[in-house]
Amino acid sequence: MDTVDALTSLEGWHAEGFAARVHYRGADDHYSIEYYEPSDCILYWKVKGDGETAVPVGRETVPDPLRKRIRQDLTEAGIDPDVESRVV
């Protein structure tokens, strides 16, 4: 099983070619998190209220509980959780 398939076996993750994506909705903020297999990295996107527009955001602006969840998902999928903090 490749890394994208491994992530999509977890709750909320969906495959899109060589990437896997999950959406997170907090009390006030909405995020789309993407794992890219070729570059072995995570990108965070903040989704605007319309649900159609997203802008990339630095991980330091992402709530710690969400970052922790993403690292846990990576671990469960057999991916080194340190890729979550890799600078892109």
Roles of regions detected by a PLM:
Residues 1-88:
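Acidic, polar-rich N-terminal leader regions of halophilic archaeal proteins
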